[in-house]
């Protein structure tokens, strides 16, 4: 955005011009004169392309274009040339080259000291060419208005006073976010925003939580943090009912239902619905390992891996078995250990109505007469409860329900199932899955 007042910073052809006296011009050989003319014409073309308004052609350029000698009366005041700089260093007077240089914000004119800087004409021309490139930085966005430099965005035409402001603005068009948080990988357009965000992780922000004293970088971050203490989860998924404290986590969860994957790796084209997983995946290609152990220097791509590694040094064992009290560093080892302890076996509940042969019905279960699709009569049993039971195929389309414990063997019953099967079809034994006993 253009401001109403700007510091004056004049840039003209005179700032990059070199003048010779008649004697100086006579001392140059043809190759040096040709090089001089080439550089001056190039300087003039560069300045003319950058200035936004027309200006008179300098006499020096007119002489060079006509092939005339460019020398003439000394363009600088001879009284000034006889002066001594404030630092006590003599400036070029009659011998050597006379140069006009921009030396301060007010663009005061000074003379270039000899000081061994320019040892020959060719070296001097090369120096002036480099100085011109540094002055304008060959920036295609640079424009000059009224002798002042501005930087214009080619996308939207917005004008800025400083090139750094333009570069930051251009990120809004490209979407580039070069500054990343080392803790969570979140990216930002400016280093300031990244620094403010990182204070959330270390608890040094200006907004302090009254519950735990942690400092947050913004009022919004404080509000989200306080939900940890209150247990509030205002964002609820309409699909499954799961609730979340943060809207970002809620939106990320929604992608599990929609199957949407916004983040695609440009290296291998693998897509992710979660930004954090996408960031971790990219480290496979870049080799980046931002989490480094302070004890041994080992680095990791994920924060959780770094936390687990710390237990090697601290000896922490957070996973404790409730049966025997043994503790483990790793969750995987804890799960494997749990398998060593016998799991409490719950009684099996066989849900009815089951078709049972009336000849073998148990006296403990009152039979109820049903009309089946088969010609033989059958008895419906509302439920049969056994600690364990196995269905064993027998001849024909009958199965034996054999309890393994808890009921005398005399209570074995013949169960009619799959009445449409032929006698040759004998399914394999089926073990019933245990379920909780209903009252």
Curated annotation (Swiss-Prot):
InterPro entries: KRAB, KRAB_dom_sf, Znf_C2H2_sf, Znf_C2H2_type. It is found in: Nucleus. It holds the Pfam family KRAB. The keyword DNA-binding applies. One of its GO terms (biological process) is regulation of transcription by RNA polymerase II. A zinc finger (C2H2-type) spans 151-173, 179-201, 207-229, 235-257, 263-285, 291-313, 319-341. CDD domains: KRAB_A-box. Residues 11-83 form the KRAB domain. Its main location: nucleus. It comes from the Eukaryota. GO terms for cellular component: nucleus. The keyword DNA-binding applies. Keywords: DNA-binding, Metal-binding, Nucleus, Repeat, Transcription, Transcription regulation, Zinc, Zinc-finger. GO terms for molecular function: DNA-binding transcription factor activity, RNA polymerase II-specific; RNA polymerase II cis-regulatory region sequence-specific DNA binding; zinc ion binding. Coiled coil: none annotated. SMART domains: KRAB, ZnF_C2H2. May be involved in transcriptional regulation. Belongs to the krueppel C2H2-type zinc-finger protein family. This is Zinc finger protein 621. It comes from Homo sapiens. The lineage of its organism: Eukaryota, Metazoa, Chordata, Craniata, Vertebrata.
């Amino acid at each position: 955005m253009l401001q109403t007042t700007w510091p004056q910073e004049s840039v003209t052809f005179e700032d990059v011009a070199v003048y010779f006296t008649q004697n100086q011009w006579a001392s140059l050989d043809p190759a040096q004169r040709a090089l001089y003319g080439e550089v001056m014409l190039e300087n003039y073309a560069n300045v003319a392309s950058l200035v936004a308004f027309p200006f008179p052609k300098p006499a020096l350029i007119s002489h060079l274009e006509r092939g005339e000698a460019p020398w003439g009366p000394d363009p600088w005041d001879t009284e000034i040339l006889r002066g001594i700089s404030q630092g006590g260093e003599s400036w070029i007077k009659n011998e050597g080259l006379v140069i006009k240089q921009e030396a301060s914000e007010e663009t005061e004119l000074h003379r270039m000291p000899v000081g061994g800087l320019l040892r020959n004409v060719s070296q001097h021309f090369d120096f002036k060419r480099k100085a011109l490139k540094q002055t304008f930085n060959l920036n295609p966005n640079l424009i000059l208005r009224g002798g002042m430099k501005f930087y214009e965005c080619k996308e939207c035409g917005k004008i800025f006073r400083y090139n750094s402001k333009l570069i930051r603005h251009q990120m809004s068009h490209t979407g580039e976010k070069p500054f990343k948080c080392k803790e969570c990988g979140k990216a930002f357009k400016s280093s300031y925003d990244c620094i403010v965000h990182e204070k959330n992780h270390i608890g040094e922000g200006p907004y302090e939580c009254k519950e735990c004293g942690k400092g947050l970088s913004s009022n919004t971050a404080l509000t989200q943090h306080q939900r940890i203490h209150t247990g509030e989860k205002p964002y609820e998924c309409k699909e499954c009912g799961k609730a979340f404290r943060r809207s970002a986590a809620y939106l990320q969860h929604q992608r599990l239902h929609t199957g949407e994957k916004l983040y695609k790796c440009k290296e291998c084209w693998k897509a992710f619905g979660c930004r954090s997983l996408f960031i971790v995946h990219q480290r496979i290609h870049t080799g980046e390992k931002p989490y480094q152990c302070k004890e041994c220097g080992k680095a990791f791509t994920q924060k959780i891996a770094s936390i687990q590694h710390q237990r090697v040094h601290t000896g922490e064992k957070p996973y404790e078995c409730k049966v025997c009290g043994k503790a483990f560093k790793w969750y995987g080892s804890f799960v494997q250990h749990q398998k060593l302890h016998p799991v409490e076996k719950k009684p099996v509940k066989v849900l009815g109505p089951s078709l049972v042969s009336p000849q073998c019905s148990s006296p403990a279960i009152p039979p109820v007469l049903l009309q089946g699709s088969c010609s033989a009569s059958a008895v419906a049993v509302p439920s049969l409860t056994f600690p364990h039971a196995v269905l064993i195929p027998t001849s024909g389309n009958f199965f034996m329900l054999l309890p393994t414990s808890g009921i005398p063997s005399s209570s074995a019953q013949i169960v009619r199932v799959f009445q449409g099967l032929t006698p040759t079809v004998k399914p394999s034994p089926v073990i019933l899955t245990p379920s909780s006993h209903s009252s």
